[in-house]
Amino acid sequence: MLTQKMKQPFKTAQPVLFPPLADRAAWESLPGAARWAAAGQAALADARTAPELPLSLWLQFTRSGDRAKWEHAYFARRRTLCALAMAEAVTNRGTYLPALADLAWRICEESAWQLPAHNSYIRDTPQLPLPDVTRPIVDLFAAETGALIATVCGLLGEALDAYAPGLAARLRGEVERRVLTPYRTAHFWWMGNGDEPMCNWTPWCTQNVLLAAAQCAPAEELPAYVQQAAYSIDCFLKDYGDDGCCSEGAQYYRHAALTMFNALDLLCKMAPGVFDVVWAEPKIRNMAEYIVNMHIAGPYYLNFADCSPLAGARGVREYLFGKRVGSLPLMTLAARDWAAVLAADPDPDRLHHPDDSEGINLFYHIQAAMAEREVTDFAETAAPAAPHDVWYPSVGILVSRRGAYALGGKAGSNADSHNHNDVGSVTLYRDGRPLLIDVGVETYSKKTFSPQRYEIWTMQSGWHNLPQFDPDGAKYDQQPGAAFAAADVTVTDALDGLAMDLAPAYGSVPGLGRYRRSVHLTDTGLTLRDETDYPGTVALTLMSVEKPAVDGDTVAFGALAAAAVTGADKIVTEAVPIADPRLRQAWPDTLYRTRIYFTQQLSLVIG
């Protein structure tokens, strides 16, 4: 899509990404100026106690699989640097420069900018125990750090040199050595390679390399960055269907389609007139609007794979993406979310967000600050967009809404990026509240992206709203991989029902030839029917937030809804304690698993 736009010679330009520090009218008139000045004061204290990154902390990943402690300290430095930079930009008094310079210097003295969990040169190979300082790796957060330091230079370079002559050159030199030179001279898997599958790494890293190049690379090198970036984005786009569905889930939209938006926007600025026509492509608009279609109500989104149901509030970047592709629904969702965050959230800029990697991109902060007034003004008059039903054939996801109910059904395969073995699973909401849930994923560890991934309970089909065969014996669950997929998938014309054969997702199960699941949503609730030729016992799992109460053939999920069950041999329930910090961001300390045992036929009517 993009590379074909470069068949003719094109010119590049050094883009203007934001007003210079000298434009005091632009910076001092920002509606968030006082908020950022206050954040800077807090950041001064944080900078004095900025965490160390000793070798022992790096080694925890290799030795115990714990990646969280290193990442907490690593990201804290970068969030603090963002706050100091924004505070200095809105005040321009030099108050924050000493702490900012010290912290930027410390980041430049880190042995590596990549995470321990990403310390490998070949995709899907074991991480090396230590970084090779002579051969930098450009991973997600080396690229993020390069963009951060480059943006500090682009915004405050002259001020830093006035404070410490030569400091800006040192900072730019580290960006060149650790990010730009490796990008030009080495091949990292996320840069794209023919038909090799890509994921959110591709646009995310590409966006940040372009930010670094736009502010640190000499003008004569820009064409090389543009050409490689355009190729990489094409490699990312090839893995999306024309319907625009993100197989990684709503939570990864901000790292996938949304970083692609900024990458495309940067390409348009760096190569004027070359790529602008891409914004009119239906596929790009569909990718933009995916997040609108997955939204249930309030903070909740339909979730599959590693995605959390709390996929995060939309904000300025989504608004700008919607504006670029002419999507009023996306602009509306984003503007209303951002206005609500500004009104009620004491940390709207995510400087203290539970997800440590939030709030570390200085360009995002500038982008949001410059558009904040426009977005909040738009929110005052924007009426909520009416949600609609959608079928995403590329991934096999149905979103259906009837009355108080919203249904998410997943067909597809077990080869998604961030995959869980969840073919055929359903999630159900009533009145915007979760009824049948997808638990999501625990805090990332060494095991999460390793051959042992499916030892983690949240990845297994037995902990989704799916059947398990021979539950008291062999416990046959689904298997990972593209071959383990739904078959004979049909969707109703009204987009209120989905049917499929789940048997292929389980591989070789003795006696299993067919497992037909059908779901149908009406204004009064959900009907789910499962039929199989498997001769033995099957246990259907239902995961819920509400505590189930069994009364004969009825399962009540608190006061939210009840399931009338036909065909059950027995029904058992268990409490599932939730202690993991990542899961606790979305769920209370206890979830519930209902197991409905049956043979060959089962019917549920939930309402």
Language-model features and meaning:
Residues 43-54, 100-118, 166-191, 224-244, ...:
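Long, well-ordered core segments of solenoidal/helical folds
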Residues 436-448:
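Cytochrome P450 core scaffold surrounding the K-helix E-X-X-R motif
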